[in-house]
Amino acid sequence: MGKKDKSITYKDTGVDIHSGNEFVKKLPSIVNSTFDKNVINGIGDFAALYSLENEQLSNPLLVSACDGVGTKIKLAIDTKNYSGIGQDLVAMNINDLICTGAKPLFFLDYLSMSKLNI
């Protein structure tokens, strides 16, 4: 028999679970201020719950959108100017919703990075 292959861990691939957990602990103080009475659960879960019970909707239909900043992040990195990236991200998603006639109720996020420095 040959030697046993070593299992690859998250840490081996550059993922620092501890740093990620520390980052998630800091988010509620910022994000919770955006919640309204319809948000059922908070940050850190893998899915979110939003109640339509308090909405006055005659024909309820949920519309979701998820968009990224695309190549604009490359320009931000090259110029070291990140000031508009977050605003642009939110604006692009809201624009995708309102052009359908939908009312923005919540924001879906996706955070991706090569290394988390907190």
PLM-predicted stretches and their roles:
Residues 2-38:
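N-terminal amphipathic/basic leader segments beginning at the initiator methionine
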Residues 29, 35-118:
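Glycine-rich phosphate/pyrophosphate-binding loop regions near the starts of catalytic domains
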